[in-house]
Amino acid sequence: MAARGGKNGLLEKWKIDDKPVKIDKWDGSAVKNSLDDAAKKVLLEKYRYVENFCLIDGRLIICTISCVFAIVALVWDYLHPFPESKPVLAICVISYFLMMGILTIYTSYKEKSIFLVAHRKDPAGMDPDDIWHLSSSLKRFDDKYTLKVTYISGKTKAQRDAEFTKSIARFFDDNGTLVMDLFEPEVSKLHDSLAMEKKTK
């Protein structure tokens, strides 16, 4: 595993409740979540981008509608005991599972593996916001973490991607502590490659 580096520069920012990010190295979900959170912090804190919650809001709306159908079925069955409530229950059950199907499609094809949507405001306030996406993957029983950065021009809507795939051992020390001064440069390198390409066009 990587040796833990010094606490200088940006490293002091990468804390959760003023404690280093420490996880169980054998818990794939915890490893992925800690790396995702750290990558998110780079864009939001270092580059001062503004997070957009549109994807999360969409999922919450679908889940809320599903819950409404479930609550209506429960209340209606209480006020009008079965079999009188049968037609309404049937409609609510069908609607609930329909919404669950929509949620599955939404998370699979809209959200995908995106965990951050961030906006970069135009300093002059003339052009639409540039949009940055972060998405990642870490397969079960695999040590290869893939981080993908997507840039969408607010002006031209052109889209460009950059990604890296590296072993998680590069970013955690023997105690399971995330070494931000090793991880942050990798994230910044992806971001800067897209930002530099944008300036040269």
Curated annotation (Swiss-Prot):
Pfam family name, one: SPC25
Family of the protein in this entry: Belongs to the SPCS2 family.
Localisation per UniProt entry: Endoplasmic reticulum membrane
BP GO terms, sorted: signal peptide processing
Residue numbers on the Lumenal membrane side: 81-86
Cellular component terms per the entry's GO annotation: signal peptidase complex
Protein purpose: Component of the signal peptidase complex (SPC) which catalyzes the cleavage of N-terminal signal sequences from nascent proteins as they are translocated into the lumen of the endoplasmic reticulum. Enhances the enzymatic activity of SPC and facilitates the interactions between different components of the translocation site.
Record text on subunit structure and interactions: Component of the signal peptidase complex paralog A (SPC-A) composed of a catalytic subunit sec11a and three accessory subunits spcs1, spcs2 and spcs3. Component of the signal peptidase complex paralog C (SPC-C) composed of a catalytic subunit sec11c and three accessory subunits spcs1, spcs2 and spcs3. The complex induces a local thinning of the ER membrane which is used to measure the length of the signal peptide (SP) h-region of protein substrates. This ensures the selectivity of the complex towards h-regions shorter than 18-20 amino acids.
Domain of life: Eukaryota
PANTHER family named in the record: MICROSOMAL SIGNAL PEPTIDASE 25 KDA SUBUNIT (PTHR13085), SIGNAL PEPTIDASE COMPLEX SUBUNIT 2 (PTHR13085:SF0)
Main localization, broad class: endoplasmic reticulum
Protein topology in the membrane: Multi-pass membrane protein
InterPro entries: Spc2/SPCS2
Organism: Xenopus tropicalis (Western clawed frog)
TM region(s), chain numbering: 60-80, 87-107
Name under which the protein is recorded: Signal peptidase complex subunit 2
Cytoplasmic side: 1-59, 108-201
Keywords: Endoplasmic reticulum, Membrane, Transmembrane, Transmembrane helix
